[in-house]
Amino acid sequence: MAKASFGFPAAALRAQALGEVHSRPYALVTTPRVIFQLAFITEGGSIVDHAVLSELSRARGIAPPGRDANHHAMPWGQGTLRWERHTEFSTYFWDAPAPERFGGEVPIHPFGDGFSPPGLLISGIRLEIRPDTPEAREAIKAFDPTSLCYSETKNGQAVLLTDFRQNGDGLTQILVLDRGMTEAGTGALVQRLLDIETYRTLAMLGLPLAQSLSPEIRRTEDGLTGVTQRMKENVREKADEMLAEITRLAAELEAGAALSLYRFGASRAYYGIVQERIRTLSETPVPGYETIGTFLERRLAPALRTCQSVEERQANLSRKLARATALLRSWIDVELERQNSALLNSMDRRAKLQLRLQQTVEGLSVAAISYYVVGLFGYLAKAVSHELPVDPGVLTGLAVPFAVIGVWLVVRRIRRHHEEGAHK
């Protein structure tokens, strides 16, 4: 057992699976401390983030992260700058010693003029951890009392205060009063609070889209109602026109549904993360104040229900449009079958008429050809009349039935030959 034991071949993804649980370690946070976290929507993916981090790394004289990296940390000033890549956004976290008073200026930080944002800012947070002292509690006055969330957590080891409003820098301010937490416990609490603020903002992105889609869905519903009312009047001669209108309405609906599919799904996922983080806070309410959980639930839940309602309206309307389309197509198919039947009957009548005409022409042809044949026979009889004991006129008359029968047989044989060739 001195050598490396159990050295079996490992599955291809084993190392990645084992390392995933350690990919987001909590930062060890001391008290007092101020933390800034900015979240950016990054449409360019990690390429843009890598360019920003490479520039910051060169300025600090350290190696930049690898191109495939999803997280990176570097020393910056009196703290650490941490970057993490998520599905549609990236976060930049930096901590430093807290200023003398809550909300005080932090003159040196990595997000100054030399910082190139990788995308549009979606969330900005300033979180301060301070010892629970009478001086620190004076900071309660800095929050808006109409939306102040004030609670205890970690069995009374910490006090949480925030009003979810933004300061002059556009950052949501959060104050944590420390009553004896460990550095690891403080780091875990800080990460939960940062996640709650970041993901609750992302979860709300679906609401403006839902509000913009609602009038469009209403117009589509009204359009469908108009078409179905016309269908109820049994105006089948306008089925093509109504089908075109239904198709246009369905195209508009599907365009909106495709636009909202990802956003609504992401909002549900982000809302689930917020709810999970709130549960892990295990807040104890302070009498007279709301907890973070109850405050956000009262505001996030209606927004998510609005998104869900729009999704359900889209799905129901899509089914109604499909049923109306199927009914109109059945009308059109029945009308096409009726027209085809009428066309076939007309073609059948035309074929019968053509056959009678052909038979008439054949009869006339037999008479005409027989006439010429008899005439030729008459000329022949006259030419040899001096050698015949019978009058040429009598011979010509006797030749008439034979000529007619012979020509008729020839014409019949030719027609039968043509019919057999057509069937092959």
Residue ranges, per PLM feature:
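Extended alpha-helical interaction modules
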Residues: 84, 95-245, 251
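Alpha-helical transmembrane anchor segments
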Residues: 352-424
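Membrane-associated alpha-helical segments
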Residues: 250-374
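N-terminal pre-transmembrane cytosolic regions of membrane proteins
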Residues: 1-123
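Signal for well-folded cores of large energy- and translation-related assemblies
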Residues: 225-228, 232, 275, 365, ...
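Short, positively charged
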Residues: 166-182, 212-217, 221, 256-281, ...
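Cytosol-facing regions at membranes
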Residues: 123, 181, 273, 302, ...
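Hydrophobic alpha-helical signal-anchor/transmembrane segments
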Residues: 1, 158, 168-170, 178-191, ...
